[in-house]
From Swiss-Prot:
GO terms for biological process: filamentous growth of a population of unicellular organisms in response to biotic stimulus; phosphorelay signal transduction system; positive regulation of filamentous growth of a population of unicellular organisms in response to biotic stimulus. It comes from Debaryomyces hansenii (strain ATCC 36239 / CBS 767 / BCRC 21394 / JCM 1990 / NBRC 0083 / IGC 2968) (Yeast). The keyword Ion transport does not apply. The lineage of its organism: Eukaryota, Fungi, Dikarya, Ascomycota, Saccharomycotina. Required for stress adaptation, morphogenesis and virulence. Pfam families: Response_reg. Signal peptide: none annotated. This is Stress response regulator protein 1. Keywords: Phosphoprotein.
Length: 242
């Protein structure tokens, strides 16, 4: 499972990637409010820029926790400046909500693609699957999505129905994303399937390995790209498989 944790600097209102467990809520109380009380968050500045890992987010306190128990829902909320990700958690006393921008830089308007594409998502992290699903539904409102946490089921799914793009995590138990990509590319009848990796392992040397395995594109976690960039990259993969 790809894993990223973030620590927060309450003074600068920016997060930094960290490898140690910390109670991020203790450092970001000014960004948390109780839904029952309806108290709005007190933003320290109008030009805040939280580099939140919305694609692999989880609250941590002490030891790393089970994401599926810590997060119950994630949804997009309207914002005048940028789209945001609303994450509800139920483990830190009541129903709290953390609001974070879902992209960095200026928000670029995009036109959703209404084609009825079929997407296959595989990631051993349930929350990653849910958030990627919501991103894709934002970009492709008429798409059909099949998602699984079990990488060993992918080949059976590909043989049972037609998919336009498979989104693969790289580090998974069972079969890795690289192993899956090689298996897919070995079958001529699956050559029309686009393969996109979504992973924290996205150095240039990693991408060379992915390309050699037959992966068409790589998105790095955290997925800090504009919607316009994401849909442009996916469209490029789709066009190449026509």
């Amino acid at each position: 499972m790809d894993q990223v944790q973030f620590d927060f600097d309450s003074k600068s209102s920016c997060s930094t990637q960290t490898r140690h467990s910390a109670n991020i809520f203790n450092k970001t109380n000014n960004m948390i409010y109780n839904n029952q009380l309806g108290t709005p968050p007190a933003l320290p500045s109008p030009d805040y820029d939280y580099r939140m890992d919305y694609f692999h987010y989880k609250p941590v306190s002490g030891d790393v926790r089970d994401e599926s128990a810590d997060m119950v829902e994630a949804e997009y909320v309207d914002c005048d400046l940028k789209p945001k990700l609303s994450v509800d958690v139920n483990t830190f006393g009541g129903n709290q909500q953390f609001i974070s921008p879902i992209e960095l830089g200026e928000y670029k308007k995009f036109t959703p693609n209404t084609n009825p594409y079929n997407f296959l998502l595989v990631d051993d992290n349930f929350i990653n699957l849910k958030i990627l699903e919501r991103v894709l539904l934002k970009l492709y409102p008429n798409c059909t999505i099949v998602k699984t946490q079990d990488s060993t089921k992918i080949m059976a799914l590909l043989h049972s129905q037609t998919f336009d793009v498979a989104f693969l995590d790289i580090e998974m138990p069972g079969l890795t994303g690289i192993e899956l990509a090689k298996m897919i590319r070995m079958e001529d009848k699956l050559n029309q399937v686009g393969i996109i990796a979504v992973t924290t392992k996205s150095l240039p040397c990693d991408k060379i390995i992915y390309e050699q395995a037959g992966i068409d594109h790589t998105f790095a976690k955290p997925l800090n790209y504009s919607f316009d960039h994401i849909i442009t990259c996916i469209e490029k993969v789709l066009r190449a498989k026509i």
